[in-house]
């Protein structure tokens, strides 16, 4: 089977809450607690925007002095807030979700934010890889979610090859890259970036390794990264593997034998870790675009399909946990790219309509979203012809979502 056109995947975000699968009805049980949720590469892939009013970039020597960069950290630049301004957009009420375009500056990634990964470490988002319409990148960029500044840190060591549709999983302060590919090449390699030392390593991994793949997903649970699905260039996959990262000097692969009916072979899906449950939304096998939602209990390894009213077909979308909701943004529905926001309630196990104000991002897929300081950041994407290099922000409106349900039980159907 050939992969779906634009064979890149967004990387899911995982933000654990407490969910336990209990065979019963499809409605949820008790809500117990309310509270606040808690490389080196070509320089052609970036551009530098400078102005006399912008602060110096991290690592740029001060005039007559040494570099302000502190070893092992990203130097934060103090600057006045840079606020978006658009006379055509009305101010949003405090209880509404509000889209705006981030006023970014610095060394900006150009045309490669498509099938890339973005991993949040403290307040810094680390971007790796991605592609334009010609080639893939192996560059690293950093985005400060407080100052909106892009920078390009120097990295060293055993650099990974240019890649798209890989996974990037945060383990302590290290980013573990697995799989991906470029052109007709699919990878089965593991690389680790230490965000403190900025050194890449390619560790030895014991055990039988999974087949090369891209467009898969990975979530971290109890010291293991659970990989699901993807494609190998000939067929879509529905296998589950674990990469044991509990000891970073002794990584190990294992294939899992799951229980019950499995999801069909797929890629372009998303996977979120909610407590001990991995929730898989949508995806494609190269022919069909799926609208189903599956749950894998990572303690019992049992698959369960959720019965959802008015499901939505999606591939190359993103899914981010915000309290007791999954925020599903964009993607492709099998016919066209979408720009809408879907909210899936993890308590009622149902989609809820929700409107937004401001200027929403245009229709796209293969973007990345992540949650930082009660804001949902959207990075890049692709609409079938144009890769985007912009950053959008969805303000989640504290009055509407905080405090919110952060500890809850889910009752899965048998």
Which ranges hold each PLM region?
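Kelch-like beta-propeller repeat domains
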Residues: 1-414
């Amino acid at each position: 089977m050939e992969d779906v056109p634009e064979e890149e995947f967004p990387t899911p975000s995982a933000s654990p809450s407490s969910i336990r699968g209990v065979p019963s009805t499809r409605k949820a049980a008790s809500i117990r607690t309310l509270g606040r949720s808690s490389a080196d590469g070509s320089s052609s892939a970036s551009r530098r925007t400078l102005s006399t009013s912008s602060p110096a970039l991290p690592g740029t020597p001060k005039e007559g002095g040494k570099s302000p960069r502190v070893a092992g950290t990203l130097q934060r630049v103090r600057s006045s807030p840079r606020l978006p301004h658009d006379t055509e957009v009305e101010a949003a009420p405090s209880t509404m979700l509000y889209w705006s375009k981030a006023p970014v500056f610095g060394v900006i990634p150009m045309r490669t934010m498509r099938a890339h990964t973005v991993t949040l470490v403290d307040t810094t988002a680390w971007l790796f890889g991605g592609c334009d319409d010609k080639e893939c990148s192996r560059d690293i960029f950093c985005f400060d979610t407080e100052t909106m500044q892009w920078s390009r840190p120097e990295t060293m060591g055993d650099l990974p090859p240019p890649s798209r549709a890989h996974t990037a999983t945060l383990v302590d302060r290290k980013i573990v890259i697995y799989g991906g590919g470029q052109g007709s090449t699919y990878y089965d390699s593991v690389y680790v970036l230490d965000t403190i030392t900025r050194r890449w390593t390619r560790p030895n991994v014991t055990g039988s390794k999974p087949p090369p793949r891209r467009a898969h997903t990975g979530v971290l649970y109890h010291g293991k990264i659970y990989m699901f699905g993807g494609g190998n260039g000939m067929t879509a996959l529905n296998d589950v593997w674990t990469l044991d990262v509990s000891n970073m000097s002794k990584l190990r692969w294992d294939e899992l034998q799951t229980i019950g009916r499995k999801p069909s072979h797929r890629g372009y899906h998303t996977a979120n870790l909610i407590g001990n449950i991995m929730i898989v939304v949508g995806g494609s096998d190269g022919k069909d675009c799926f609208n189903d939602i599956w749950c894998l209990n990572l303690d019992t390894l049992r698959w369960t399909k959720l019965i959802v009213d008015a499901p939505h077909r999606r591939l190359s979308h993103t899914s981010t946990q915000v309290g007791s909701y999954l925020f599903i943004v964009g993607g492709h529905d099998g016919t066209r790219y979408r720009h809408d926001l879907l909210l899936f309630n993890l308590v009622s196990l149902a989609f809820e309509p929700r409107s937004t104000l401001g200027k929403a991002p245009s229709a796209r897929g293969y973007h990345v979203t992540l949650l930082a300081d009660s804001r949902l950041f959207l990075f890049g994407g692709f609409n079938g012809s144009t890769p985007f290099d912009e950053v959008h922000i969805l303000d989640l409106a504290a009055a509407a979502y905080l405090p919110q349900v952060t500890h809850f039980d889910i009752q899965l159907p048998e």
